[in-house]
Amino acid sequence: MSRTKVLESLVDGRATREGTQQFRKRFANAQPDHFYRPLVDGAVVSSLGLGTYLGECDDAEDARYTATVIAALDKGVNILDTAINYRCQRSERAIGEALHTVISGGDIKREEVVVCTKGGYIPLERTPPATKEGYRGFLHSEYYGPGIMGPDDVVSGGHCLTPRYLDDQIERSKKNLGLASIDIYYLHNPEQQLDVLPRPEFLDVMRAAFTTLENQVRRGVIGNYGCATWNGFRVPPENRNHLNLEELLSVAREVGGEHHHFRVIQLPVNLAMTEAVRTPTQKIGSDRVPFLEAAHRLGVSVVGSATLVHSQLTRSLPEQLHSAFPGFSSDARRAIAFAQSLPIAAALVGMKSVPHLEENLECPKTS
């Protein structure tokens, strides 16, 4: 089946508690039991997730990602992370190609895989425009002209969270992924809006975005939603770009009631970026605690990103970390082991080669 037909025929269903538990049982002999962990909605995910951020915008890179996603699903990884802007939409499409292959072949059921994507940054189409004029022309033809968003909706040259824009991006992501429903949909670095907006106006933006996402949940288009951040939850309250989890949960309850679907946060946590573990950035009532403690208290799942910090943690780690993580033959696996030792659902690692996938999967087997 051609990729065009895949886009026209979306796979129904989404990840379920029962489906992901069945996936876990199927790999009982290949992965230790602690390799799988629950999200707050009961679905179970592998503690190593596959990320798709880096890479060239070309067909060869697409093929590498597709092959690695297929291999990951075959080896017990069932949480896939991407974003519509990654590699000019190619990362979503590579995942879609892989999912079509394994689902249509009967190797994997849709209900067994947790697929996550993000919206916020304006995605390009296959390759970046060659000039600034080309980019401006792209914005006008693709977004401004059709009325999906206007120039005043765009922050920092390429970030937007308006309701109509988010609705549009979700539909595009569905087609890219070949899926009728997305399991986790993140607002991508919402703290970017705080570069220009006062906090009260920012909360209005988040309120409107959460309302849009709750409506998408009711339609069955997404399962749960959250925020995928870089700085927001790691910086202190005094920082302009600070995000407070309790405050955002209050907004979610305001628009979605006590049974809202704001349930997952993604943020960097690794050997080099330990703020989520050590730095008390979050206020809960009169307490000030690190983010991971706040998430635990407030009942929000956490997915860790930048586990290897774009390969920076794959070499030259201090000798004391070798003794702290005995039995590991590489710094990459020590860094992954650190992330997997934390109270998070999954640690994301960008992987676009099967040998790297296989090396990284050795980590939980020897811990």
Task: List each model region and its residues.
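Active-site mouth loops of central-metabolism enzymes
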Residues: G51-R64, P151-D167, V196-P200, Q320-S329
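An active-site-proximal structural segment forming one wall of the substrate-binding cleft
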Residues: H159-S181
